[in-house]
Amino acid sequence: MDALSPKKQPIALYPGTFDPVTLGHLDIIRRGARIFDHLIIAVAENPGKSPLFSSEERASMIRHEISRLENPTKSRIEVIIYNSLLMDCVESQGASVILRGLRAVADFEYEYQMAGMNQQINNKIETVFLMADSVLQPVASRLVKEIAFYNGNITPFVPPYVVQKLQEAVTRKKSFQD
């Protein structure tokens, strides 16, 4: 390749449970889409977790939020659902980068270990970490769900559409518990 010819940016895959998608996730998505030509948001169907929302509901919420982004950003983002080993998903999508967001040191330890395991599986796939915006560092889907369950204010943590969907889901869950 000629030194002056433009280098093609790799395809990146941003995996997660996104139960629900938070402003922190959306920040990583926006920033990742600025860095990579194509960003695939991969919504995990994780048998080890009991999500509040189905994988299709989670993907739908992400698609809704992406539709609100400006072009060309939103045209470079795709949302998929996967239920396989992450590295199999990465390879099947033609991605060469796994994008991950980091909030704190505890995230780093876990993500570093995962990146190491993924490197052992396929050393051609790189993991790129983006630090969470300092305002969004404490935001975690798990905590947002807990706050919503106790009727707390979740508007600083998730977009309005997700607030509505989360309130509906919590109401359904509470009605089943009664």
From Swiss-Prot:
- Which keywords belong to this entry? ATP-binding, Coenzyme A biosynthesis, Cytoplasm, Magnesium, Nucleotide-binding, Nucleotidyltransferase, Transferase
The chemistry this enzyme catalyses reads:
(R)-4'-phosphopantetheine + ATP + H(+) = 3'-dephospho-CoA + diphosphate
* Swiss-Prot/TrEMBL site (Transition state stabilizer) positions: H25
* Annotated GO MF terms: ATP binding; pantetheine-phosphate adenylyltransferase activity
The answer, when asked if ATP-binding is one of the entry's keywords, is yes
Q: What is its EC number?
A: 2.7.7.3
Q: Which domain of life is it from?
A: Bacteria
**Enzyme class name:** transferase
Q: Name one GO cellular component term.
A: cytoplasm
The record ties this protein, via InterPro entries, to: Cyt_trans-like, PPAT, Rossmann-like_a/b/a_fold
Which pathway is this protein engaged in?
Cofactor biosynthesis; coenzyme A biosynthesis; CoA from (R)-pantothenate: step 4/5
The family note in this entry says: Belongs to the bacterial CoaD family.
Entries under NCBIfam families matching the protein: coaD_prev_kdtB (TIGR01510), cyt_tran_rel (TIGR00125)
- State the function annotated in the UniProt record: Reversibly transfers an adenylyl group from ATP to 4'-phosphopantetheine, yielding dephospho-CoA (dPCoA) and pyrophosphate.
Q: How does it assemble?
A: Homohexamer.
The protein's name is: Phosphopantetheine adenylyltransferase
